[in-house]
């Protein structure tokens, strides 16, 4: 039996490993690097963009077309390069991210999401196509993987406070400890 342990700030999907798993600018922080690595066996190209998405009550995601009251987006204040990367097997590259126009930021939290989308391979022009059977119909599905990570800008002191009260520690079935909130 073997166990592989990855640090908790790493995300991988579709052979793309991203670290750290979120971009956060607060205080005097004005730049950072995202590290991308291709963990697959083939060369892969990824397009990088910023999206506005939110989580729905059922846990799914939706694109934001109308912002909620008081909702602020970070995309106007973030510059990043390159906008696309091509990585060979086991290759890595850094994406430089900078906070811009910071003098225009009002106190509060700004949020967007970096979207890393794989770009399917296309055959070069002039390459001979394989002979096709013209007596049948076929369909070819090409999966396009994508992953998002949050980009957050925090300006000023946080006003969020949490208080837990009426906590109880119980033993369920006399063997399993359990916290209960009233």
Task: Name each model-derived stretch.
Residues 11-44, 84, 160-182:
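Beta-sheet-dominated interaction scaffolds and their linkers
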Residues 26-27, 89, 106-107:
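Surface-exposed loops/turns
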Residues 32-37, 90, 97-99, 112-116, ...:
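Buried hydrophobic-core signal for structured, non-transmembrane domains
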Residues 42-50, 59-60, 108-109, 162-163:
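Short, hydrophobic/aromatic beta-strand segments
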Residues 46-72:
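Short acidic, flexible loop segments centered on an aromatic residue
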Residues 51-54, 100-154:
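Terminal connector regions
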Residues 66-103:
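Intrinsically disordered, low-complexity Pro/Gly/Ser/Thr-rich segments with frequent PxxP/GP/PP motifs
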């Amino acid at each position: 039996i073997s166990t592989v342990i990855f640090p908790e700030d790493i995300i991988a999907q579709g052979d793309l490993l991203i670290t750290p798993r979120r971009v956060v600018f607060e205080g005097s922080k004005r730049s950072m690097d995202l590290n991308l690595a291709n963990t697959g066996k083939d060369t892969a190209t990824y397009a990088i963009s910023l999206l506005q998405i939110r989580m729905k009550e059922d846990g799914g995601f939706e694109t934001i077309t109308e912002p909620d009251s008081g909702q602020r987006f970070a995309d106007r204040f973030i510059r990043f390069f390159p906008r696309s990367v091509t990585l060979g097997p086991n290759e890595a590259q850094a994406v430089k991210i900078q906070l811009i126009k910071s003098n225009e930021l009002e106190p509060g939290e700004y949020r967007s999401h970096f979207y890393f989308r794989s770009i399917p391979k296309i055959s070069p022009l002039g390459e001979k196509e394989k002979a096709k059977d013209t007596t049948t119909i076929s369909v070819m599905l090409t999966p396009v993987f994508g992953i998002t990570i949050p980009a957050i800008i925090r300006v000023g002191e946080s006003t969020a406070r949490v208080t837990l009260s009426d906590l109880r520690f119980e033993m369920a079935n006399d063997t399993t400890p359990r916290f209960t909130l009233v």
